[in-house]
Amino acid sequence: MKTLLKNGTLIDYKTNTFEKCDILIEDDKIAKIEKNIEEKAEKIIDCTNLYIMPGMIDIHCHLREPGFEYKETIKTGAKSAVCGGFTTICPMPNTKPTPDSTIILQKIIDEGKRVGLCNILPYASVTKGERSEERRVGKECRSRWSPYH
C-alpha cells in the first residue's frame, strides 16, 4: 500500500531545516522525500500547515500500571503519547508492585508490546521497593538484558 503525505513541512534535525515537501510511504517504509511527488497512492493526506518529524521520546512519564490502573493504564498512556507525537516512552518506577526485578519489568515490557502503540522502555527501581535499603536490580538486569537491545 502507498500513502502520500502532500505539502507538509518536514523538520530535519540533522540539518536544522524546515522544508516543504511530499513524502511517499510504501509498505510502511519511507520510499521518497521530494517536492511535488506525482505518484499514484491509495491514500493521500493533505499536510498543508502541518509539520512532519521523527517520533519523539518521552524520557519521563508516569504510567500507573501495575497497581494504579484506576489512574492510567499502559494502553491509555500509550494512546496519549502517540497522540502527542511520541513513539517511545520511558515510565517512572512508581507503580505497585515497584519494578525492582526483571520479572516485573518484563511484564511491563510485554504489556507494552501487547498494546502495540509505541515503544515502552520502563525504568527500574534501583533499590527494592524504592526504599533505598537493598540494591537489587542492577546486576539482575545486566545479566538479563544487554544495554543496547
Q: Where would I find each of the regions flagged by the language model?
A:
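General beta-strand structural signal in soluble alpha/beta enzymes
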Residues: 45-46, 91, 122
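Distinct, well-ordered alpha-helical segments
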Residues: 101-105, 131-136
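Metal-associated gating/positioning segment near the N- to mid-region
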Residues: 50-115
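Positively charged, low-complexity/disordered segments
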Residues: 138-149
